[in-house]
Amino acid sequence: MDNYLSKLNPQQRDAVTYCDGPQLVIAGAGSGKTRVLTYKIIHLLNNGYKPHQILALTFTNKAAKEMRERISLLVGDEVATKLWMGTFHSIFARILRFNASHIGFKSDFTIYDTYDSTSLIKHIIKEKELDEKQYKASAVLHRISMMKNALYSPADYARTSEFIKEDEAHQRPKMAEIYLQYWERCRIAGAMDFDDLLFYTNILFRDHPDVLKQYQEFFKTVLIDEYQDTNFAQDNIVYQLAKNHQSIFAVGDDAQSIYSFRGANINNILSLTKRYPKLKIFRLEQNYRSTQNITLAANSLIEKNTSQIKKSLFSENPVGSKIKIKQFQSDYDEAFYIANTILGLKQRMSYSWNDFAVLYRTNAQSRILERAFSSGGAKDTHGNTRMPIPYRIYGGTAFYQRKEVKDAVAYFRLVLNPNDDEALRRVINYPKRSIGQTTINKLQAAANEFNLSIWGVLTKTGLCGVKLNKGTLAKLSEFKSLISTLIERNSETANAHEMVKEIIGQSGLIEVLANDNTPENVSRVQNLEELVASAEMFVKNQLEMEGGNTSLCDFMTDVSLATDQDKDTDHANAVTLMTVHAAKGLEFSNVVIFGAENDFFPSTKSKDSLAGIEEERRLMYVAITRAKENCIITHASQHTINGKLTPANPSPFIEEIDSKYVEKIGRPSFMEQDRPSSRPSGHFVNTFASSSPNETKAKVSVMPTKLTPINQAVAKQAHTPSTASSQGGYTTHTVAELHVGQPILHQRFGYGTIKQIDTSSDHKIIVDFENSGVKNLLLGYAKFKIQ
């Protein structure tokens, strides 16, 4: 361990060894962020810090596990297991369980996942007899999530006129009522959702300064990974813990801030010096992942952003091939070309299938790629009909989201917390007990009337007046007896493995699947056996840790807080298809960015503000920097939307990449697209192949240098014939067409009046909308009608 500093480059070493105040480490793509975090902890341990005094917060269990394993190799398991290291949610769930009584919860509160929360929202909407299309459960839950992340309680929400007006404008005037009822039902059920874990930690620290002081003194230093992804609630918790000792080590990259739709706020990292005036900034600028061309191309794109911490990444890897850019007539042609390109490169360069990734903006775009990859009619490099290309959709049905696993987990939750209505509703009639939906609705109505959980109604003499026949009452009594017996059994053992086996056995889950011996049910039984094995492994791991807890409650906390990245365990040798958002933090030898068109990059919803455009540019930057060796960007003149071909323009970000680092490949004719319907050409063009410096290649057309990138887009669109995107009269406009005081009608924001016109390089207008308030619109992107 003595020579650990020798494994760091000078910039990494400076960041690790500095101990004179708060730090921000700007870690560019591929610059060794995890290594720096790991060695910072080692350095702290070497300089007198006790393991329990170090709080390290990550966004995924995978990241925390990787860091802990690296630390274990250097200092041993005994020290590594004493660190407070984990995701924001897992660490603060732990703190909340210790202090649950302060906030009106029991220590064994249930943690709802997105499925549970959505299910509860659906029940509330149905009970209120609201239009389920107008009040889409996922949209309602997202609204509530954003409010919690901004620390707005239901009461705060109801008295904020801006929110009420927004809800009325979106024809959802009952949002405040739904939020309040959701909040109350969670408390009755003794449950918290993911956002509550952060919300209630803030409440705990605000209302109980003695508890806050305890943790301020307990944690002598706080390390945070991916600081650019923090939301208001997370940022505030970190500040409360670190504001006295100012010992904070924040690592992140503002250029990779792409999660504002989840509540992440880039200003948390950009304005960290305001929180910590003595903050020292370190920059990790050497990219160990990508070739020089990919690194410099990405630099040339992201430097167009105005809101950023300046940095200049470099690479000492080989120069590599230029980024290839290719246009197609349709996304159908585009998808089949990508399939054949991947096939050709794999055959020529001996890559594995999992060395390739195809990235896109939205999940809906994967359909046409799946068709191209699945088709057995496409041609190989010799013009012969090829077999389908193996692929996987990243983020498919994860283990803990499979029905049989969720059924078992619902039983676990009910044993731990019988007031958990979502769990009870899921299993009260599974396996079938002749307890129908009408009975459940009657029980829920009584629960609502008496402010109880459904279990609370079941345990009351006379069921709070619910009228049921004798047969149904007998079935309910059997169910109550089963759960009560399992609850008593759980109180007698602290071993999750034993309880998981017993619950699965006593509930009848295995039996009902085994009775119908189909291949699907055999697989489901195997999944339940895997669940038992995972509980056994959990207990084994906990016993190896000093003070480790092996209870069912602790196992369920571990299960509940698995993140999206942690759930993806498919390591099959296949091409990965995924959104750019899902790709963050990953890397592949070869990356194709599919559908690089305006309205995808940037998305339609992001075009109305400079902040939105800059986040979309960061998204393209993230896509490019996933590539280690080769990157190709494709786009089509027409793409398919709802089964119809719609005209499309290239993403303006393509033109913003310095032409020195890109190579445009000429558009092939219709018959050259090795599609199932075309004749074999007998020749394959490897678009990833490195160019000879002496070869003359087509170059990207560059606008005059006096124009900024946004002006390029304005000029380009001003001379582009109207397409489907401007149908209905909504289109972009130039400064010459507008004046202050002019009324307009915007696609999203409705009616408004122009208050100010910025004639600087941004060509921005400020509009006061009747229902949406004041907005900044970029003329190169915003579509509206002049009234």
What does each of the following model-derived ranges do?
Residues 44-56:
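Conserved SF1/SF2 helicase motif Ia
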Residues 34-42, 67-68:
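Motif I (Walker A/P-loop) of helicase-class P-loop NTPases
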Residues 595-776, 781-786:
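C-terminal accessory regions
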Residues 122-191, 209, 266:
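Basic/charged alpha-beta structural segments of nucleotide/phosphate-handling enzymes
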Residues 25, 29-37, 277-280, 286-384, ...:
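Helicase P-loop NTPase motor core
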Residues 168, 366-378, 387-388, 402, ...:
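Conserved helicase C-terminal RecA-like lobe
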Residues 6-25, 36, 55-56, 63-66, ...:
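Conserved helicase NTPase motor core
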Residues 53-58, 62-142, 152-156, 326, ...:
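Conserved P-loop NTPase-based nucleic-acid remodeling module centered on helicase motor cores
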